[in-house]
Design a protein with these regions (language model features):
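N-terminal Rossmann-like NAD(P)+-binding domain of SDR-like oxidoreductases, especially those catalyzing
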Residues: 1-149
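NAD(P)-dependent short-chain dehydrogenase/reductase
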Residues: 4, 97-106, 128-199
Length: 200
């Protein structure tokens, strides 16, 4: 992973926490980590998760998000004591598709996938690999299709944090008699389901 630990610094010093650096794009790194720890469960949250960035860096997005998942699954397949595996999938896999049985309903497991970005394609590949390894190699693998989820640790490149950060900046600028640039957002017609990270 990247060396940025700012979002987990609150438990870095906890006596039961031991940070092991790894790289999902390097099978040897995954092998060393999993064989050192011998976990009961593995949660793959690794991804290059910015849709916009995925258009600028499709290879990086694929290598981390899709190939990284496959690398983890391959290491688990070769382990004697196989841990359970969870893949964090994304609602981006659906693209603009509706529920097959009722267009008024939200997307669910009956909705066709129609990815619209390199990120969504990579997530769909990881999702599909997890299903394949469950069926073909008898690995306990499952995926959760996550929609947008928010918390105080959400990066400031995401829309909710952009808006809340802008409101705070605007407040302080107004107090100090300063002007700040206008807030710039992307597609204002986009519809999303949001939840809190603790609910996931």
């Amino acid at each position: 992973s990247t060396p940025n630990t700012s979002r987990i610094k609150h438990f870095l010093t906890h006596k039961q926490f031991h940070l092991i650096q790894g790289d999902v794009t390097d099978s040897g790194s995954i092998y060393r980590c999993l064989n050192e720890v011998q976990p009961d469960e593995v949660y793959n949250l690794a991804a290059q998760s910015h849709v916009g960035t995925s258009f600028n860096q499709p290879n990086l997005t694929w290598n981390v998000t899709a190939q990284g998942c496959l690398n983890i699954l391959e290491v688990i397949r070769d382990m004697g004591n196989r841990p359970r595996f969870y893949q964090a999938s994304s609602s981006e896999m659906f693209g603009d598709q509706y529920n097959l049985y009722d267009k008024e309903k939200y997307q669910d497991e009956h909705t066709y996938f129609r990815p619209q970005s390199p990120y969504a394609i990579a997530k769909l590949a990881a999702h599909s690999a997890t299903m394949l390894y469950r069926r073909s190699y008898d690995i306990f693998g499952c995926s959760g299709i996550l929609f947008n989820h928010e918390s105080e640790r959400r990066g400031e490149r995401f829309v909710t944090r952009k808006v809340t950060r802008y409101v705070a900046d605007l407040y302080w600028a107004t107090q100090e008699g300063r002007m700040i640039p206008k807030l710039q957002l992307g597609n204002l017609n986009a519809k999303r389901d949001w939840g809190h990270a603790e609910d996931y």
